[in-house]
């Protein structure tokens, strides 16, 4: 009984904290108040600690990793979003937009788990024999980590598309490189007349108030690429470990279960994104559109099967 009471306390504290942190980060986008952004970062760390305590507490009284039902997977997804934020914050000089993306992600998944799911779905139960496998735990944890990173990366791409509307792509992703080259190679014969005119346009543009917007777009593009690259790797590991586990449990590596089919679709979408970035050299709008599509594909893969209530991966939600 004490474990359940402690879980409820930690769930309410962590949700209240992440709600406040979300409001703080959204506020920093409007008002540049000194110290407000750092308060959001500290709040995210406390939220991470509370959610960690909740998951450990549930692990202790259930006797297994808290990854066995939809409630636990949502809480783990919220925890993963806070981990992702903390890791990126260490390397980011301006975390306002980072927090404005990761904090709402953690809040919405946490809120849906605690407020949106029926109480009977929040209870922990005994694992069936097929789930009592180390491959099972590796598979589920890697997949949920990949969901968190892919969703955050896709949200960064969606934010990029919104901010980038009405801004010339070539100006954003070509200006800095051209100006840098001009500074390093100031030979007058190096540039044609048209090139010099182009550089002048870039210089005028970067002298305007749009400079910060360009910087933000490039930063969002960088975050999206890094997050999706990490999420794609985690998704690959999770899918391969799931195939090994499925072969041990059911004698088949791949059975075209609905979630397996959507896993392949998800993997393909983000493989296309990474291909366009690494081999085609695309930046900005084109790969961001692919990543934005991936955002919806991930949610279909994660919740679509549960809404339908079919397949081996269904948690049974909304089943008659």
Curated annotation (Swiss-Prot):
Disulfide bonds: none
Alphabetized Pfam families for the sequence: Cytochrom_C_asm
Keywords carried by this UniProt record: Chloroplast, Cytochrome c-type biogenesis, Membrane, Plastid, Thylakoid, Transmembrane, Transmembrane helix
InterPro entries for this protein: Cyt_c_assembly, Cyt_c_biogenesis_CcsA, Cyt_c_biogenesis_CcsA/CcmC
Annotated transmembrane regions: 9-29, 36-56, 70-90, 97-117, 143-163, 227-247, 254-274, 288-308
Cellular localisation: Plastid, Chloroplast thylakoid membrane
GO MF terms held by the record: heme binding
The keyword Nuclease appears for this protein: no
Gene Ontology biological process: cytochrome complex assembly
One term under GO cellular component: chloroplast thylakoid membrane
Protein topology in the membrane: Multi-pass membrane protein
Family the UniProt entry places it in: Belongs to the CcmF/CycK/Ccl1/NrfE/CcsA family.
Subunit-structure text: May interact with Ccs1.
Role this protein plays: Required during biogenesis of c-type cytochromes (cytochrome c6 and cytochrome f) at the step of heme attachment.
Protein name: Cytochrome c biogenesis protein CcsA
């Amino acid at each position: 009984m004490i474990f359940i009471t402690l879980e409820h306390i930690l769930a309410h504290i962590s949700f209240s904290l992440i709600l406040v942190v979300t409001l703080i980060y959204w506020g920093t986008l409007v008002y540049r108040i000194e110290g407000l952004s750092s308060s959001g970062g500290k709040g995210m760390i406390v939220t991470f600690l509370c959610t960690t305590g909740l998951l450990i507490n549930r692990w202790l009284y259930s006797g297994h990793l808290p990854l066995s039902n939809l409630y636990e997977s949502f809480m783990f997804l919220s925890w993963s979003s806070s981990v992702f934020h903390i890791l990126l914050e260490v390397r980011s000089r301006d975390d306002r937009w980072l927090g404005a993306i990761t904090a709402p992600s953690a809040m919405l998944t946490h809120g849906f788990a605690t407020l949106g799911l029926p109480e009977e779905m929040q209870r922990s139960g005994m694992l069936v024999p097929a789930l009592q496998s180390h491959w099972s735990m590796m598979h589920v944890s890697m997949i949920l980590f990949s969901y968190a990173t892919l969703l955050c990366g896709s949200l960064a791409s969606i934010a990029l598309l919104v901010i980038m509307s009405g801004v010339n792509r070539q100006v954003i992703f070509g200006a800095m490189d051209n100006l840098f080259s001009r500074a390093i190679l100031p030979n007058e014969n190096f540039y044609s007349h048209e090139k010099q005119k182009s550089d002048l346009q870039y210089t005028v543009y970067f002298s305007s108030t749009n400079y910060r917007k360009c910087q933000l777009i490039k930063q969002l593009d960088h975050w999206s690429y890094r997050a999706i690259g990490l999420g794609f790797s985690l998704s690959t590991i999770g899918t391969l470990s799931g195939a090994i586990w499925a072969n041990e449990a059911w004698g088949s590596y791949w059975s075209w279960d609905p979630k397996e089919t959507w896993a392949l679709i998800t993997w393909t979408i983000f493989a296309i994104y990474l291909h366009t970035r690494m081999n085609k050299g695309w930046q900005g709008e084109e790969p961001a559109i692919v990543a934005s599509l991936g955002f919806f594909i991930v949610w279909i893969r994660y919740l679509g099967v549960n809404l339908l209530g079919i397949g081996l991966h269904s948690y049974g939600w909304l089943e008659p």
